[in-house]
């Protein structure tokens, strides 16, 4: 009926807006809101109208969800790369954090946008058909950041590149607050102060 057609037109429009989003020019908050709305509306349509998967609307809805999921899978896949550019590790077997040269603010901003996407989509990733990728990205980022945090505190205590380490430390705290918790970020701040005092 007419209501169904209106709802599906709205879903198509939302899906098209999400598909038009590209790296590197994207607003994380806007994209999160678009995907959240799409996920909620598509879930509501499925539940309320009891869309049959094999029907015309069921196929349309499935197609829209697959396309939105594909876009978000791409962003989730790229998150680790962007964070590793902003929090670089040395090449080689040991792979400890690299403080040999400063990281520019644009790279940190890009990494922050990706982390906000990963964290911000946690509650609706499954409904948006990218739950597995979101979970993988989140776990990968958490593991990477824990390793980096250990190295940055060590560098602040007795490293040769303390000024670079301090800039990276503040950025790592911001990521820690997002990926873990504000409490974990506060613990990190205290460890940093202790490292500076011991330097």
What is the predicted role of each segment?
Residues 1-156, 163:
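Extended alpha-helical scaffold segments
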Residues 35-38, 169, 192:
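Short amphipathic alpha-helical coiled-coil/interface segments
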Residues 58, 62, 178-199:
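Beta-rich interaction/scaffold domains
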Residues 141-190:
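Extended alpha-helical scaffolding segments
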